[in-house]
Amino acid sequence: MQLCIISLWFLAAFIVNADNVQFEDYESNFFFKEHLGTLSPYHEPYFDGLDSAFPETCEIQQVHLLQRHGSRNPTGDVTATDVYSSQYLNNFQEKLLNGSIPVNFSYPENPLCFIKQWTPVIDAENADQLSSRGRLELFDLGRQLYQRYYKLFDSYVYDINTAEQERVVESAKWFTYGLFGDKMYEKTNFILISEGKAAGANSLSMYNACPVFKDNNFHKNATDAAHAVWRNIFIEPIVNRLAKYFDSSYKLTINDVRSLFYICEYEIAIKDHSDFCSIFTPSEFLNFEYDSDLDQAYGGGPVSEWASTLGGAYINNLADSLRNVTNPDFDRKVFLAFTHDSNIIPVEAALGFFPDITPQNPLPTDKNIYTYSQKTSSFVPFAGNLITELFFCSDSKYYVRHLVNQQVYPLIDCGYGPSGTSDGLCELQAYLNSPIRANSTSNGISIFNTECQARPTNVTIYF
Protein backbone atom coordinates (compact mmCIF):
# COMPACT_ATOMS: atom_id res chain seq x y z
CA MET A 1 0.00 0.00 0.00
CA GLN A 2 2.88 2.35 0.85
CA LEU A 3 4.40 1.70 -2.57
CA CYS A 4 1.11 2.59 -4.22
CA ILE A 5 0.83 5.88 -2.30
CA ILE A 6 4.40 6.86 -3.18
CA SER A 7 3.94 6.01 -6.84
CA LEU A 8 0.65 7.92 -6.89
CA TRP A 9 2.61 10.99 -5.80
CA PHE A 10 5.00 10.53 -8.72
CA LEU A 11 2.08 9.89 -11.05
CA ALA A 12 0.33 13.07 -9.89
CA ALA A 13 3.47 15.06 -10.60
CA PHE A 14 3.52 13.60 -14.10
CA ILE A 15 -0.18 14.20 -14.74
CA VAL A 16 0.23 17.93 -14.09
CA ASN A 17 1.93 18.01 -17.49
CA ALA A 18 0.23 14.97 -18.98
CA ASP A 19 -1.16 16.94 -21.91
CA ASN A 20 2.39 17.74 -23.04
CA VAL A 21 4.12 14.38 -23.16
CA GLN A 22 7.65 14.72 -24.54
CA PHE A 23 9.12 12.66 -27.36
CA GLU A 24 12.63 11.65 -26.38
CA ASP A 25 13.94 12.59 -29.83
CA TYR A 26 11.88 15.71 -30.40
CA GLU A 27 12.35 19.19 -29.00
CA SER A 28 8.70 20.20 -29.35
CA ASN A 29 5.90 19.03 -27.09
CA PHE A 30 3.65 16.14 -28.04
CA PHE A 31 -0.02 16.99 -27.49
CA PHE A 32 -1.63 13.59 -27.23
CA LYS A 33 -5.18 14.96 -27.36
CA GLU A 34 -4.54 15.95 -30.97
CA HIS A 35 -3.69 12.34 -31.88
CA LEU A 36 -6.78 10.43 -30.74
CA GLY A 37 -8.06 9.81 -34.26
CA THR A 38 -11.76 10.43 -34.78
CA LEU A 39 -12.20 10.66 -30.99
CA SER A 40 -9.88 13.67 -30.70
CA PRO A 41 -11.31 16.84 -29.17
CA TYR A 42 -11.94 19.62 -31.67
CA HIS A 43 -8.76 21.39 -32.76
CA GLU A 44 -7.41 23.14 -35.81
CA PRO A 45 -5.14 21.11 -38.11
CA TYR A 46 -1.60 21.98 -39.14
CA PHE A 47 -1.59 22.80 -42.84
CA ASP A 48 0.63 25.31 -44.66
CA GLY A 49 -0.24 28.28 -42.50
CA LEU A 50 -2.36 30.02 -45.14
CA ASP A 51 -4.23 33.09 -43.95
CA SER A 52 -7.90 32.28 -43.28
CA ALA A 53 -8.98 35.95 -43.35
CA PHE A 54 -11.19 37.01 -46.25
CA PRO A 55 -9.08 38.16 -49.23
CA GLU A 56 -8.88 41.97 -49.22
CA THR A 57 -10.18 42.36 -52.77
CA CYS A 58 -13.05 39.87 -52.43
CA GLU A 59 -16.56 39.74 -50.99
CA ILE A 60 -18.02 36.57 -49.51
CA GLN A 61 -21.04 35.27 -51.47
CA GLN A 62 -21.83 31.82 -50.07
CA VAL A 63 -20.78 29.58 -47.19
CA HIS A 64 -21.37 25.82 -47.09
CA LEU A 65 -20.88 23.88 -43.85
CA LEU A 66 -20.54 20.10 -43.52
CA GLN A 67 -20.34 19.59 -39.76
CA ARG A 68 -19.66 16.55 -37.58
CA HIS A 69 -21.47 16.14 -34.26
CA GLY A 70 -19.70 17.08 -31.04
CA SER A 71 -17.87 15.00 -28.46
CA ARG A 72 -19.99 12.10 -27.27
CA ASN A 73 -20.21 9.08 -25.02
CA PRO A 74 -19.36 5.68 -26.52
CA THR A 75 -21.88 4.20 -28.91
CA GLY A 76 -24.41 1.61 -27.80
CA ASP A 77 -24.26 -2.15 -28.34
CA VAL A 78 -26.83 -4.29 -26.53
CA THR A 79 -24.69 -7.40 -27.07
CA ALA A 80 -21.76 -5.73 -25.25
CA THR A 81 -19.32 -7.37 -27.69
CA ASP A 82 -17.95 -4.28 -29.46
CA VAL A 83 -14.87 -3.15 -27.53
CA TYR A 84 -15.59 0.52 -28.18
CA SER A 85 -19.23 0.37 -27.01
CA SER A 86 -20.62 1.83 -23.80
CA GLN A 87 -21.82 -1.55 -22.60
CA TYR A 88 -18.48 -3.30 -23.16
CA LEU A 89 -16.49 -0.49 -21.55
CA ASN A 90 -18.95 -0.31 -18.67
CA ASN A 91 -18.38 -4.02 -18.00
CA PHE A 92 -14.61 -3.58 -18.34
CA GLN A 93 -14.66 -0.76 -15.80
CA GLU A 94 -16.56 -2.96 -13.35
CA LYS A 95 -13.95 -5.71 -13.75
CA LEU A 96 -11.16 -3.25 -12.98
CA LEU A 97 -12.98 -2.12 -9.85
CA ASN A 98 -14.03 -5.55 -8.55
CA GLY A 99 -10.71 -7.23 -9.28
CA SER A 100 -11.89 -9.54 -12.05
CA ILE A 101 -9.14 -7.84 -14.02
CA PRO A 102 -6.63 -7.75 -11.16
CA VAL A 103 -4.27 -4.78 -11.01
CA ASN A 104 -1.02 -5.51 -9.17
CA PHE A 105 -1.10 -2.61 -6.73
CA SER A 106 2.09 -3.83 -5.04
CA TYR A 107 4.16 -3.33 -8.17
CA PRO A 108 6.52 -0.36 -7.63
CA GLU A 109 5.28 2.81 -9.30
CA ASN A 110 2.37 1.07 -10.98
CA PRO A 111 0.72 3.81 -13.11
CA LEU A 112 -2.66 2.15 -12.54
CA CYS A 113 -2.65 2.71 -8.77
CA PHE A 114 -5.13 5.55 -9.27
CA ILE A 115 -7.84 2.95 -9.92
CA LYS A 116 -8.34 2.56 -6.16
CA GLN A 117 -9.61 6.14 -6.01
CA TRP A 118 -11.06 6.23 -9.54
CA THR A 119 -14.71 7.03 -10.25
CA PRO A 120 -15.74 5.92 -13.76
CA VAL A 121 -17.65 8.39 -15.93
CA ILE A 122 -18.54 6.07 -18.83
CA ASP A 123 -22.10 4.89 -18.25
CA ALA A 124 -24.00 2.55 -20.56
CA GLU A 125 -27.16 4.58 -19.91
CA ASN A 126 -25.54 7.52 -21.71
CA ALA A 127 -24.65 5.53 -24.83
CA ASP A 128 -24.57 7.61 -28.04
CA GLN A 129 -25.34 10.86 -26.22
CA LEU A 130 -23.38 14.08 -26.54
CA SER A 131 -21.20 15.02 -23.62
CA SER A 132 -21.42 18.51 -22.12
CA ARG A 133 -18.16 19.23 -23.90
CA GLY A 134 -19.78 18.24 -27.20
CA ARG A 135 -22.67 20.64 -26.65
CA LEU A 136 -20.28 23.47 -25.88
CA GLU A 137 -18.18 22.69 -28.97
CA LEU A 138 -21.17 23.05 -31.27
CA PHE A 139 -22.56 26.13 -29.55
CA ASP A 140 -19.22 27.89 -29.84
CA LEU A 141 -18.75 26.88 -33.48
CA GLY A 142 -22.20 28.29 -34.29
CA ARG A 143 -21.30 31.55 -32.59
CA GLN A 144 -18.04 31.76 -34.51
CA LEU A 145 -19.69 30.98 -37.84
CA TYR A 146 -22.17 33.82 -37.37
CA GLN A 147 -19.42 36.26 -36.41
CA ARG A 148 -17.42 35.38 -39.51
CA TYR A 149 -20.26 35.29 -42.06
CA TYR A 150 -22.81 37.67 -40.53
CA LYS A 151 -23.15 39.59 -43.81
CA LEU A 152 -24.68 36.51 -45.43
CA PHE A 153 -27.41 36.10 -42.83
CA ASP A 154 -30.02 38.27 -44.52
CA SER A 155 -32.87 35.74 -44.69
CA TYR A 156 -35.48 35.13 -42.05
CA VAL A 157 -35.45 31.32 -41.92
CA TYR A 158 -32.61 28.89 -42.64
CA ASP A 159 -32.76 25.22 -43.55
CA ILE A 160 -30.82 23.03 -41.13
CA ASN A 161 -30.10 19.75 -42.92
CA THR A 162 -29.19 17.03 -40.48
CA ALA A 163 -28.79 13.27 -40.43
CA GLU A 164 -31.58 12.02 -38.19
CA GLN A 165 -29.54 10.31 -35.47
CA GLU A 166 -30.21 11.95 -32.11
CA ARG A 167 -26.66 13.13 -31.36
CA VAL A 168 -26.40 14.74 -34.79
CA VAL A 169 -29.75 16.51 -34.42
CA GLU A 170 -28.82 17.70 -30.93
CA SER A 171 -25.49 18.96 -32.26
CA ALA A 172 -27.31 20.92 -34.94
CA LYS A 173 -29.58 22.46 -32.31
CA TRP A 174 -26.69 23.57 -30.11
CA PHE A 175 -24.96 24.97 -33.19
CA THR A 176 -28.02 27.01 -34.12
CA TYR A 177 -28.35 28.24 -30.54
CA GLY A 178 -24.86 29.62 -31.06
CA LEU A 179 -26.00 31.19 -34.33
CA PHE A 180 -29.29 32.72 -33.27
CA GLY A 181 -29.60 32.51 -29.49
CA ASP A 182 -33.18 32.54 -28.20
CA LYS A 183 -34.44 33.17 -31.75
CA MET A 184 -33.23 29.74 -32.83
CA TYR A 185 -36.65 28.15 -33.30
CA GLU A 186 -38.13 31.00 -35.30
CA LYS A 187 -35.01 31.29 -37.50
CA THR A 188 -34.60 27.62 -38.43
CA ASN A 189 -36.31 24.93 -40.45
CA PHE A 190 -34.91 21.55 -39.40
CA ILE A 191 -34.84 18.97 -42.19
CA LEU A 192 -34.18 15.52 -40.71
CA ILE A 193 -32.69 13.29 -43.39
CA SER A 194 -33.07 9.53 -43.09
CA GLU A 195 -29.94 7.56 -42.26
CA GLY A 196 -31.33 4.64 -44.23
CA LYS A 197 -31.87 3.91 -47.90
CA ALA A 198 -34.85 6.26 -48.19
CA ALA A 199 -32.69 9.38 -48.50
CA GLY A 200 -31.00 8.26 -51.71
CA ALA A 201 -28.54 10.79 -53.13
CA ASN A 202 -29.75 13.40 -50.62
CA SER A 203 -28.24 11.38 -47.81
CA LEU A 204 -25.86 12.75 -45.22
CA SER A 205 -25.18 9.10 -44.26
CA MET A 206 -23.95 7.91 -47.63
CA TYR A 207 -22.87 4.44 -46.50
CA ASN A 208 -26.40 3.54 -45.45
CA ALA A 209 -28.06 5.12 -48.49
CA CYS A 210 -25.92 3.06 -50.88
CA PRO A 211 -27.46 -0.44 -50.92
CA VAL A 212 -24.70 -2.04 -52.99
CA PHE A 213 -22.01 -0.76 -50.61
CA LYS A 214 -23.92 -1.52 -47.40
CA ASP A 215 -25.49 -4.85 -48.30
CA ASN A 216 -22.16 -6.28 -49.46
CA ASN A 217 -20.42 -5.22 -46.23
CA PHE A 218 -17.67 -3.46 -48.19
CA HIS A 219 -16.93 -1.17 -45.23
CA LYS A 220 -16.73 -3.90 -42.58
CA ASN A 221 -14.82 -6.36 -44.74
CA ALA A 222 -12.16 -3.82 -45.70
CA THR A 223 -11.66 -2.36 -42.24
CA ASP A 224 -11.71 -5.72 -40.44
CA ALA A 225 -8.94 -7.00 -42.71
CA ALA A 226 -6.81 -3.89 -42.17
CA HIS A 227 -7.26 -3.91 -38.39
CA ALA A 228 -6.55 -7.63 -38.09
CA VAL A 229 -3.04 -7.09 -39.44
CA TRP A 230 -2.17 -3.78 -37.79
CA ARG A 231 -3.55 -4.46 -34.30
CA ASN A 232 -1.63 -7.71 -33.99
CA ILE A 233 1.55 -5.81 -34.86
CA PHE A 234 1.32 -2.68 -32.73
CA ILE A 235 -0.77 -3.72 -29.72
CA GLU A 236 1.12 -6.89 -28.79
CA PRO A 237 4.19 -4.91 -27.58
CA ILE A 238 1.86 -2.77 -25.44
CA VAL A 239 0.36 -5.94 -23.95
CA ASN A 240 3.85 -7.12 -23.07
CA ARG A 241 4.82 -3.75 -21.57
CA LEU A 242 1.68 -3.38 -19.42
CA ALA A 243 1.36 -7.03 -18.32
CA LYS A 244 3.60 -6.49 -15.27
CA TYR A 245 1.08 -4.02 -13.84
CA PHE A 246 -1.48 -6.83 -13.46
CA ASP A 247 -1.38 -9.95 -11.32
CA SER A 248 0.78 -12.67 -12.81
CA SER A 249 -2.23 -15.01 -12.88
CA TYR A 250 -4.03 -12.74 -15.36
CA LYS A 251 -3.29 -12.84 -19.09
CA LEU A 252 -3.69 -9.35 -20.50
CA THR A 253 -5.24 -9.31 -24.00
CA ILE A 254 -5.27 -7.04 -27.02
CA ASN A 255 -8.89 -6.15 -26.28
CA ASP A 256 -7.92 -5.22 -22.71
CA VAL A 257 -5.36 -2.74 -24.04
CA ARG A 258 -7.87 -1.38 -26.53
CA SER A 259 -10.36 -0.93 -23.69
CA LEU A 260 -7.83 0.97 -21.59
CA PHE A 261 -7.17 3.25 -24.54
CA TYR A 262 -10.87 3.79 -25.27
CA ILE A 263 -11.44 4.75 -21.64
CA CYS A 264 -8.65 7.30 -22.03
CA GLU A 265 -10.28 8.73 -25.16
CA TYR A 266 -13.84 8.81 -23.88
CA GLU A 267 -12.94 10.26 -20.50
CA ILE A 268 -11.29 13.09 -22.45
CA ALA A 269 -14.52 13.48 -24.46
CA ILE A 270 -16.64 13.52 -21.30
CA LYS A 271 -14.55 15.39 -18.72
CA ASP A 272 -11.42 16.56 -20.63
CA HIS A 273 -9.02 14.52 -18.50
CA SER A 274 -8.13 10.87 -17.98
CA ASP A 275 -5.48 9.24 -15.82
CA PHE A 276 -5.61 6.27 -18.20
CA CYS A 277 -3.93 8.35 -20.90
CA SER A 278 -0.77 8.56 -18.81
CA ILE A 279 -0.06 4.84 -19.24
CA PHE A 280 0.55 5.19 -22.99
CA THR A 281 3.68 6.51 -24.69
CA PRO A 282 3.74 9.06 -27.55
CA SER A 283 4.59 6.39 -30.11
CA GLU A 284 1.66 4.29 -28.89
CA PHE A 285 -0.70 7.24 -29.29
CA LEU A 286 0.53 7.62 -32.88
CA ASN A 287 -0.05 3.94 -33.58
CA PHE A 288 -3.59 4.07 -32.20
CA GLU A 289 -4.13 7.17 -34.34
CA TYR A 290 -2.95 5.17 -37.36
CA ASP A 291 -5.47 2.48 -36.46
CA SER A 292 -8.22 5.11 -36.67
CA ASP A 293 -6.83 6.37 -39.97
CA LEU A 294 -6.85 2.87 -41.45
CA ASP A 295 -10.50 2.55 -40.46
CA GLN A 296 -11.54 5.66 -42.38
CA ALA A 297 -9.18 5.17 -45.32
CA TYR A 298 -10.21 1.57 -46.03
CA GLY A 299 -13.85 1.87 -45.00
CA GLY A 300 -14.92 4.47 -47.56
CA GLY A 301 -12.05 6.90 -47.78
CA PRO A 302 -9.19 7.26 -50.25
CA VAL A 303 -8.12 3.59 -50.21
CA SER A 304 -11.62 2.49 -51.17
CA GLU A 305 -12.79 2.29 -54.79
CA TRP A 306 -16.07 3.69 -53.44
CA ALA A 307 -14.77 7.01 -52.10
CA SER A 308 -15.70 9.15 -55.11
CA THR A 309 -19.10 7.45 -55.38
CA LEU A 310 -19.95 7.97 -51.71
CA GLY A 311 -18.67 11.54 -51.58
CA GLY A 312 -19.67 12.58 -55.08
CA ALA A 313 -23.38 13.16 -54.49
CA TYR A 314 -22.72 15.83 -51.84
CA ILE A 315 -20.10 17.45 -54.10
CA ASN A 316 -22.51 17.54 -57.04
CA ASN A 317 -25.14 19.20 -54.85
CA LEU A 318 -22.55 21.68 -53.56
CA ALA A 319 -21.36 22.45 -57.10
CA ASP A 320 -24.91 23.13 -58.28
CA SER A 321 -25.33 25.70 -55.50
CA LEU A 322 -22.00 27.32 -56.41
CA ARG A 323 -23.04 27.55 -60.07
CA ASN A 324 -26.33 29.16 -59.06
CA VAL A 325 -24.56 32.20 -57.63
CA THR A 326 -25.24 34.00 -60.92
CA ASN A 327 -28.90 32.95 -60.99
CA PRO A 328 -31.00 35.94 -59.88
CA ASP A 329 -33.78 33.59 -58.72
CA PHE A 330 -31.42 31.68 -56.41
CA ASP A 331 -31.01 33.67 -53.21
CA ARG A 332 -29.54 31.10 -50.83
CA LYS A 333 -26.23 32.11 -49.27
CA VAL A 334 -25.89 29.93 -46.16
CA PHE A 335 -25.94 26.13 -46.40
CA LEU A 336 -25.77 24.05 -43.22
CA ALA A 337 -25.49 20.24 -43.00
CA PHE A 338 -24.75 18.00 -40.01
CA THR A 339 -23.49 14.44 -40.13
CA HIS A 340 -20.87 11.90 -38.92
CA ASP A 341 -17.10 11.65 -39.37
CA SER A 342 -17.34 8.68 -41.74
CA ASN A 343 -19.45 10.73 -44.15
CA ILE A 344 -17.07 13.69 -44.30
CA ILE A 345 -13.94 11.71 -45.21
CA PRO A 346 -15.40 10.35 -48.52
CA VAL A 347 -16.36 13.91 -49.52
CA GLU A 348 -12.84 15.16 -48.81
CA ALA A 349 -11.37 12.17 -50.63
CA ALA A 350 -13.54 12.87 -53.69
CA LEU A 351 -12.45 16.53 -53.56
CA GLY A 352 -8.83 15.40 -53.89
CA PHE A 353 -7.65 16.14 -50.34
CA PHE A 354 -5.64 12.91 -50.01
CA PRO A 355 -3.66 12.53 -53.26
CA ASP A 356 -0.96 10.34 -51.71
CA ILE A 357 -3.47 7.62 -50.77
CA THR A 358 -5.33 5.69 -53.48
CA PRO A 359 -6.65 2.17 -54.05
CA GLN A 360 -3.43 1.55 -55.97
CA ASN A 361 -1.26 3.14 -53.25
CA PRO A 362 -3.04 2.31 -49.99
CA LEU A 363 -1.90 2.97 -46.47
CA PRO A 364 0.11 -0.11 -45.46
CA THR A 365 -1.38 -2.27 -42.75
CA ASP A 366 1.92 -3.71 -41.51
CA LYS A 367 3.61 -0.45 -40.50
CA ASN A 368 2.87 3.16 -39.57
CA ILE A 369 4.35 5.42 -42.25
CA TYR A 370 3.65 8.55 -40.14
CA THR A 371 3.80 11.05 -43.03
CA TYR A 372 0.53 10.83 -44.94
CA SER A 373 -2.36 13.17 -45.63
CA GLN A 374 -5.48 11.57 -44.16
CA LYS A 375 -4.99 12.17 -40.44
CA THR A 376 -8.43 11.68 -38.95
CA SER A 377 -7.33 13.58 -35.84
CA SER A 378 -6.91 16.66 -38.03
CA PHE A 379 -9.77 16.25 -40.51
CA VAL A 380 -12.62 14.74 -38.48
CA PRO A 381 -12.09 15.17 -34.74
CA PHE A 382 -15.22 15.57 -32.68
CA ALA A 383 -17.04 18.68 -34.02
CA GLY A 384 -14.80 18.68 -37.09
CA ASN A 385 -16.08 20.41 -40.21
CA LEU A 386 -15.53 21.19 -43.85
CA ILE A 387 -16.40 24.72 -44.93
CA THR A 388 -16.64 25.84 -48.55
CA GLU A 389 -16.46 29.58 -49.21
CA LEU A 390 -17.42 31.34 -52.43
CA PHE A 391 -16.04 34.83 -53.11
CA PHE A 392 -16.58 37.46 -55.78
CA CYS A 393 -13.36 39.39 -56.33
CA SER A 394 -12.23 42.67 -57.88
CA ASP A 395 -11.25 40.94 -61.14
CA SER A 396 -14.98 40.13 -61.59
CA LYS A 397 -14.42 36.41 -61.07
CA TYR A 398 -15.74 33.95 -58.50
CA TYR A 399 -13.33 31.95 -56.35
CA VAL A 400 -13.74 28.87 -54.14
CA ARG A 401 -11.87 28.06 -50.94
CA HIS A 402 -12.09 25.19 -48.45
CA LEU A 403 -11.49 25.37 -44.71
CA VAL A 404 -10.98 22.30 -42.54
CA ASN A 405 -11.72 23.08 -38.90
CA GLN A 406 -11.21 26.79 -39.62
CA GLN A 407 -7.85 26.33 -41.39
CA VAL A 408 -7.48 26.91 -45.14
CA TYR A 409 -6.93 23.69 -47.06
CA PRO A 410 -4.22 24.35 -49.69
CA LEU A 411 -5.91 23.61 -53.03
CA ILE A 412 -3.14 23.18 -55.61
CA ASP A 413 -4.89 21.64 -58.62
CA CYS A 414 -6.77 24.60 -60.08
CA GLY A 415 -4.56 27.67 -60.11
CA TYR A 416 -4.42 30.59 -57.72
CA GLY A 417 -6.64 33.29 -56.35
CA PRO A 418 -6.58 36.91 -57.51
CA SER A 419 -3.33 37.45 -55.61
CA GLY A 420 -1.56 35.17 -58.08
CA THR A 421 -0.06 33.20 -55.20
CA SER A 422 -0.81 29.88 -53.57
CA ASP A 423 -3.48 31.17 -51.20
CA GLY A 424 -5.93 28.26 -51.23
CA LEU A 425 -8.35 29.94 -53.65
CA CYS A 426 -9.36 28.55 -57.03
CA GLU A 427 -11.33 30.32 -59.74
CA LEU A 428 -14.81 28.78 -59.77
CA GLN A 429 -14.77 27.22 -63.24
CA ALA A 430 -11.23 25.93 -62.79
CA TYR A 431 -12.31 24.40 -59.50
CA LEU A 432 -15.42 22.76 -60.96
CA ASN A 433 -13.61 21.48 -64.06
CA SER A 434 -10.41 20.23 -62.44
CA PRO A 435 -9.84 16.58 -63.44
CA ILE A 436 -9.54 15.75 -59.75
CA ARG A 437 -13.21 16.51 -59.04
CA ALA A 438 -14.96 17.23 -62.38
CA ASN A 439 -16.73 13.87 -62.38
CA SER A 440 -18.15 14.58 -58.93
CA THR A 441 -19.08 18.22 -59.54
CA SER A 442 -20.95 17.33 -62.75
CA ASN A 443 -22.09 13.73 -62.36
CA GLY A 444 -21.80 12.85 -58.67
CA ILE A 445 -25.53 12.34 -58.12
CA SER A 446 -26.09 10.21 -61.20
CA ILE A 447 -23.00 8.10 -60.41
CA PHE A 448 -24.23 7.57 -56.84
CA ASN A 449 -27.67 6.56 -58.07
CA THR A 450 -26.25 4.14 -60.65
CA GLU A 451 -23.38 2.55 -58.72
CA CYS A 452 -25.32 2.29 -55.47
CA GLN A 453 -28.64 1.35 -57.07
CA ALA A 454 -29.92 4.07 -54.78
CA ARG A 455 -33.53 4.84 -54.14
CA PRO A 456 -34.71 7.74 -56.33
CA THR A 457 -35.97 10.85 -54.57
CA ASN A 458 -37.90 13.87 -55.78
CA VAL A 459 -37.00 16.01 -52.76
CA THR A 460 -34.60 18.89 -53.39
CA ILE A 461 -32.12 19.59 -50.61
CA TYR A 462 -29.42 22.23 -50.86
CA PHE A 463 -25.92 21.58 -49.53
Swiss-Prot record:
Molecular functions (GO terms): acid phosphatase activity; inositol phosphate phosphatase activity
Nucleus found in the keyword field: no
Keywords, ordered alphabetically: Cell wall, Glycoprotein, Hydrolase, Secreted, Signal
Catalytic activity annotation: a phosphate monoester + H2O = an alcohol + phosphate
Subcellular location, principal: secreted
One example of a Gene Ontology biological process annotation: inositol phosphate metabolic process
Family per record: Belongs to the histidine acid phosphatase family.
Name under which the protein is recorded: Thiamine-repressible acid phosphatase SPBC21H7.03c
Top-level taxonomy: Eukaryota, Fungi, Dikarya, Ascomycota, Taphrinomycotina
